[in-house]
Design a protein with these regions (language model features):
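N-proximal low-complexity "stem/linker" segments adjacent to membrane-targeting elements
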Residues: 1-24
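Short, acidic, metal-binding catalytic loop of nucleotide-sugar glycosyltransferases
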Residues: 24-32
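Active-site-proximal specificity loops/subdomain of glycosyltransferases
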Residues: 44-93, 101-104
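Short acidic/polar active-site loop segments enriched in Thr and Asp
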Residues: 32, 89, 121
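Short beta-strand/loop segment that forms part of the nucleotide-sugar
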Residues: 32-40, 61-65
Length: 324
């Protein structure tokens, strides 16, 4: 296991205020490489990633968007052009609002792999959605510290769809035809032989079909901060969804992810390590200034959207929701 390498692959558009905390988190987990694909950014995202690349923390890829769409184009290019992906022992695909949170061993990505059984090809980690919990303003603070209430765990009768969506870390890349947002797609000849498990090793998919094993948060979860604050959500709406480019985000999306059922601060196990690295990153004069510009850009953008009368149909019910 000592020679194994771990790579994160992500796609971003206008996510600059969140980059440093997110990068620090995945470094704290023990990932060796981070590849970030971007497209059409108008905020400091690309400048920050290029500086992080100069400092040796990430690799930046400018996505050439093809007919397959933004996400699929990015992942296809990532998987074919970069040794840090092609030669990686394990690859994890996630977005900047998703934080892997391992409850096994020392909390590292290696502990997740070691604790999920031998001969495993894919470990599918369930989402745990964290809501805005009444936060309306965008502030310069890690999302993991701002938003600490998430959805209840899976229950067969009360919450049968909790954990339905997963993010996967996988190995043995020759078994798969391509990366996927939630899981890699197996080659037809390997569908029946690909071992897909949940964290801890329980079978997740057998012969291409989901098992009845519940997607619990016992061993690991992916904290999913889909909304963040109300102001952050407005910017997300303006940016659009990379994987569903024709969808306009509104109250239906907000209500779906506005889940603040119970407090969960388990991700704090990484707090000291991430804070230390973020402090080091901000000490770099160029990166520190870019981060400040990023926060200011997003605050201005959110303020302008809130002042736009054409947005009242959304901003009014959003404010009512966060203040409820």
């Amino acid at each position: 296991m000592s020679n194994d390498t771990y790579t994160v692959v992500s796609t971003m558009k206008n996510e600059s205020p969140y980059i440093l905390d997110w990068v620090a988190h995945y470094k704290a987990l023990g990932f060796d490489h981070i590849l970030v694909c971007t497209n059409d950014c108008t905020d400091p995202t690309v400048d920050m990633l290029l500086r992080l690349q100069e400092l040796g923390f990430v690799t930046h890829h400018p996505t050439i968007v093809r007919k397959a769409g933004i996400h699929r184009s990015a992942l296809r290019q990532a998987s074919r052009r970069y040794d840090i992906v092609m030669d990686a022992t394990w690859v994890f695909v996630c977005d900047v609002d998703e934080y892997l949170n391992v409850h096994m061993g020392d909390g590292s990505v290696r502990a997740l792999v070691q604790g999920s059984g031998k001969d495993t090809d894919v470990i599918s980690v369930p989402w745990r959605v964290f809501g805005p919990d009444g936060v309306d303003k965008l502030i310069d603070k890690p999302v993991t510290q701002q938003f600490t209430k998430g959805e209840f765990e899976w229950d067969e009768k009360e919450r049968p769809t909790t954990g339905k969506f997963v993010k996967s870390i996988y190995t043995n890349q020759d078994k798969f035809q391509r990366m996927g947002l939630h899981a890699p797609v197996s080659l037809e000849e390997h569908v029946g032989t690909t071992k897909r498990v949940l964290p801890g090793g329980a079978d997740y998919v057998v012969d291409g079909k989901r098992t009845d094993n519940p997607p619990l948060f016992t061993h690991a979860q992916v904290n999913h901060y889909a909304l963040r604050s109300m102001e952050s959500f407005l910017i997300k709406r303006a940016r659009g969804r990379a994987n569903h480019s024709s969808h306009v985000l509104g109250m239906e999306y907000w209500d779906r992810f506005n889940l603040n059922d119970e407090k969960d601060t388990s991700i704090d196990r990484y707090k000291s390590a991430t804070e230390k690295l973020v402090k080091e990153l901000k000490a770099d004069k160029m990166l520190g200034e870019l981060h400040k510009k990023a926060v200011a850009w997003h605050k201005r953008k959110a303020g302008a959207m809130k002042m736009d009368p054409e947005m009242d149909e959304l901003t009014v019910p959003l404010l009512q929701s966060v203040k409820a």
